[in-house]
């Protein structure tokens, strides 16, 4: 049993909600003793099944507290036999207490003293003003952009914030790396939940808020705001499954869709038309829709534009705006450094999304192009996200990739920079709270795409998994694929694995690392060894390696 007070819009309701999660058969009856006890305490006769009885008890307890009974609902979660009862709330203490007493009622443990205390709990809530901690529309004075998806959220958030700031506006954003006001870090850590959004929206300097939003915050606390003006949904892939009752990618998409569901009717939702799961969320949206695609001939794009909508698409190496019969060139990918002239397709996806969001904010085409052109893939603008260095004739690609699709993109991009006949060494691993299937998938991708695989262990991110277990799963997959001879013999941390790969490499080789833990130490080592950002050093060599 779990009771959770969700302070903002969530997967159950687009308002603050209490979630009461139970392990329960849908037709499980109310025990006879509980029915008799409830009749004595509340003077009511319960329906026969728990699933029918609990909403009635919640309603009666609200009345006894002096509150209007809310409309309660049930939802089956992905975890077998897990059901969630949910209802809206306004006062925290009494709302949670009602959930606790509802469970006690079904268990036959409800007593009159507990029920009689509810008005006092409500009065205390009101004295303390213990209400949902989210930013209501009447308290929000600036435009807000919500950014969600599985991969690319932080990069898209950073890029859009840079575009806004480059045109002269004060911008605040929150992301996995912290809360920033005009580029200055004011809170360090992962702030993709409601606390980060509240901090940005409360800052008196900020004129535009860009709010990266991860599924964890939505599931555990709800959104940190009532609505946004523009939202972006990038993609959905299998990540963080089997957590908090979410076991399928379809339900994961629904959780992330909360960000686009709360976009104001007069606002704009930006959806990636290349991802069928993202495109399917159109039915949940109340705002206008803008689509993006890396295929100008995508049927969804053509139908959307023909129906009066607009889209930002990749057409060869141009990024263009399609609206009605017009085709407007926004910029060429050679002028978008973060895409490495279009080689990094997953970064192109982020550029398209940020561009559509910028246009939705009223940013001019010229300001958009200027912002994209000055956002470089380095530690100044996008630390840890596809940062490429040339070092002694080798390429080192450092990226935050942490799942199967991220690793696949990392390998494909790294290969695109290499000349034939050279080797790609890949450092692979992820956080321990991922499903076993994620480690299996990483093993398959590494076995298929790398010439040499270094399995990494990150103790800081074991998150309950025994040390060595994730590495063992990946090792078994790679060996079963006949690629055991391409495995480095021991698992190392990120920094030591990179040193080992560098020592074994030759000029012309590339080393790609899934780096989530030791970024700063790695960047320091590369700097001390004289490595240069590849976009700067590429001019000295057509192959992209230092001369």
Language-model regions: role of each:
Residues 142, 263-268, 285-288, 422, ...:
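A short helix->loop->beta-strand "cap" motif at the edges of active sites that frequently abuts
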Residues 246-253, 267, 287-408:
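Adenine nucleotide phosphate-binding catalytic loops in nucleotide-utilizing enzymes
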Residues 191-284, 290-291, 296-303, 335, ...:
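Flexible active-site lid/hinge loop adjacent to a nucleotide/diphosphate
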Residues 88-142:
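Extreme N-terminal, non-catalytic leader segments
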């Amino acid at each position: 049993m779990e009771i959770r007070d969700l302070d903002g819009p969530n997967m159950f309701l687009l308002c603050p909600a209490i979630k009461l999660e139970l392990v329960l058969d849908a037709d499980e009856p109310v025990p006879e003793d509980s029915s008799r006890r409830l009749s004595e305490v509340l003077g009511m006769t319960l329906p026969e099944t728990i699933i029918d009885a609990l909403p009635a008890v919640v309603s009666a307890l609200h009345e006894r507290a002096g509150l209007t009974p809310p409309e309660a609902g049930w939802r089956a979660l992905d975890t077998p036999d897990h059901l969630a009862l949910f209802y809206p709330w306004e006062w925290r203490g009494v709302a949670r207490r009602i959930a606790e007493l509802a469970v006690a009622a079904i268990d036959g443990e409800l007593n009159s003293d507990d029920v009689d205390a509810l008005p006092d709990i409500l009065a205390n809530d009101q004295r303390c003003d213990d209400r949902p901690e989210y930013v209501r529309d009447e308290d929000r004075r600036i435009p807000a952009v919500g950014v969600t998806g599985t991969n690319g959220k932080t990069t898209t958030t950073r890029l859009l914030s840079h575009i806004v700031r480059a045109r002269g506006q004060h911008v605040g954003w929150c992301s996995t790396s912290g809360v920033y006001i005009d580029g200055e870090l004011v809170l360090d850590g992962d702030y993709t939940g409601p606390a980060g959004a509240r901090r940005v929206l409360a800052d008196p300097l900020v004129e535009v808020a860009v709010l990266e939003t991860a599924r964890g915050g939505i599931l555990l606390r709800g959104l940190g705001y009532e609505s946004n003006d523009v939202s972006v949904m990038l993609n959905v892939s299998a990540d963080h499954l089997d957590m908090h009752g979410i076991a399928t990618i379809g339900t994961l998409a629904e959780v992330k869709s909360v960000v686009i569901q709360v976009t104001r009717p007069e606002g704009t939702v930006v959806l990636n038309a290349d991802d069928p799961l993202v495109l399917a969320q159109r039915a949940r949206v109340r705002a206008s829709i803008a689509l993006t695609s890396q295929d100008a001939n995508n049927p969804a794009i053509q139908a959307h534009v023909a129906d009066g909508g607009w889209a930002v698409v990749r057409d060869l190496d141009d990024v263009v705006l399609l609206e009605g019969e017009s085709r407007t060139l926004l910029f060429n990918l050679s002028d978008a450094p973060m895409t490495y002239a279009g080689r990094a397709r997953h970064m192109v996806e982020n550029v398209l999304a940020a561009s559509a969001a910028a246009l939705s904010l009223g940013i001019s085409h010229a300001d958009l192009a200027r912002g994209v052109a000055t956002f470089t893939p380095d530690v100044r603008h996008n630390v840890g996200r596809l940062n490429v260095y040339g070092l002694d004739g080798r390429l080192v690609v450092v990226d935050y990739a942490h799942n199967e699709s991220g690793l696949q993109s990392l390998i494909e991009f790294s290969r695109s920079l290499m000349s034939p006949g050279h080797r790609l060494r890949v450092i692979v691993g992820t956080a321990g709270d991922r499903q076993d299937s994620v480690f299996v998938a990483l093993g398959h991708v590494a076995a298929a795409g790398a010439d040499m695989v270094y399995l990494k262990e990150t103790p800081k991110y074991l998150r309950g998994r025994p040390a060595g277990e994730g590495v063992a799963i990946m090792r078994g997959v790679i060996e079963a694929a006949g690629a055991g001879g391409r495995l480095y013999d021991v698992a190392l941390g990120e920094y030591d694995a990179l040193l080992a790969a560098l020592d074994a490499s030759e000029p012309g080789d590339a080393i790609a690392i899934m780096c989530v833990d030791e970024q700063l130490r790695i960047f320091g080592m590369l700097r001390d060894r004289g490595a240069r950002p590849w976009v700067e050093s590429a001019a000295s060599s057509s192959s992209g390696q230092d001369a």
